[in-house]
Amino acid sequence: MAFIAKSFYDLSAISLDGEKVDFNTFRGRAVLIENVASLUGTTTRDFTQLNELQCRFPRRLVVLGFPCHQFGHQENCQNEEILNSLKYVRPGGGYQPTFTLVQKCEVNGQNEHPVFAYLKDKLPYPHDDPFSLMTDPKLIIWSPVRRSDVAWNFEKFLIGPEGEPFRRYSRTFPTINIEPDIKRLLNVAI
């Protein structure tokens, strides 16, 4: 079993440009973490909605995208290729993320990123689909398999301004529909 951090603020990641992203700097802001893939059927929808949320709450929300290849190999780009894939292929049209993308990682299994080990421990299943599991067991390419595993691309985790994981959302929950929960956490009028 992977090491599980004691606090959200003990975690970190490495951005696509190689810089350390220290979660301790997120104190006082809500954080939305989403495992992403540039070749998924909902890539365009989810990436544009992530940009929209980041733009709506520029100083009070941090959005982090974690590219992952564990679901249908739908993030088969290397780290240095991901931004060009998003810009020219999907969503395309010159798309540029307004949020931070970190280096490609695993979200399940023996080599899962510590961020996902922590989040899955605190939020073991999506609130909107507590029975969410991988729909086709032949697609599972990691071990060990756990009930709390991320089921597919674009699962989301919302963390409150005090660093407490608040809610986990399934792959089918539209990213933009998280806005009322973000407002609630930030005490913004809905």
Swiss-Prot record:
Active-site residue list: U40
Any one of the GO BP annotations: response to oxidative stress
CDD domains: GSH_Peroxidase (cd00340)
InterPro entries: Glutathione_peroxidase, GPX_AS, Thioredoxin-like_sf
GO function terms (MF aspect): glutathione peroxidase activity; phospholipid-hydroperoxide glutathione peroxidase activity
EC number: 1.11.1.9, 1.11.1.12
UniProt keyword annotations, A-Z: Cytoplasm, Oxidoreductase, Peroxidase, Selenocysteine
Subcellular location: Cytoplasm, Cytosol
PROSITE patterns documented for this protein: GLUTATHIONE_PEROXID_1, GLUTATHIONE_PEROXID_3
Keyword field contains Cytoplasm: yes
Gene3D superfamilies (alphabetical): Glutaredoxin
Catalytic activity: 2 glutathione + H2O2 = glutathione disulfide + 2 H2O; a hydroperoxy polyunsaturated fatty acid + 2 glutathione = a hydroxy polyunsaturated fatty acid + glutathione disulfide + H2O; tert-butyl hydroperoxide + 2 glutathione = tert-butanol + glutathione disulfide + H2O; cumene hydroperoxide + 2 glutathione = 2-phenylpropan-2-ol + glutathione disulfide + H2O
A Gene Ontology cellular-component term: cytosol
SUPFAM superfamilies: Thioredoxin-like
Major location category of this protein: cytoplasm
Pfam families with a match to the protein in the record: GSHPx
Family the entry assigns: Belongs to the glutathione peroxidase family.
Complex formation: Homotetramer.
PANTHER family reported for this sequence: GLUTATHIONE PEROXIDASE, GLUTATHIONE PEROXIDASE 2
Free-text function comment from the UniProt entry: Catalyzes the reduction of hydroperoxides in a glutathione-dependent manner thus regulating cellular redox homeostasis. Can reduce small soluble hydroperoxides such as H2O2, cumene hydroperoxide and tert-butyl hydroperoxide, as well as several fatty acid-derived hydroperoxides. Cannot reduce phosphatidycholine hydroperoxide.
The protein, known as: Glutathione peroxidase 2
